[in-house]
């Protein structure tokens, strides 16, 4: 039914307000995201947030393992050029770890403990990590949670500034530059916003209210 509704929305907007673009957000692995573009004959969304690549990129930072990201990019590059992704590193929203866990199983990676590792890494709870993120929608029963944080804070710039450590600051900046370079070579439209355009670190003022 979702696809029928989106298809109807696309048809209506093309008649009533043809200047409007439909931007969809689907937190799933690439194979399950693609159908929301529809087909060339029956199009649905004009663009989709590239949520999965965003999450897979941060997975790559935390694991220093590029296999998942390469696997996903191989899928994306084979898609029709009419399918446009909106690519970003971070945004106003959290990171939901909707990775391709079926594919990751072959490497002995299980979903629940891996999500915990990623959340621990990006909160600076893993040795060698200077990331500073915060949990969102933490469910201790399901052992599932989402993660919030700006690119600068997740890359270690916040911690380096707090410690006044010049070496860590330089490393964090290199990490940010690398991720943005990768963002700009992806197929689609790159977007830098929600504080990332000025290297903003996390704002904790919400805790004071």
Model-identified regions with their sequence ranges:
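Active-site and adjacent substrate-binding regions of carbohydrate-active enzymes
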Residues: 1-209
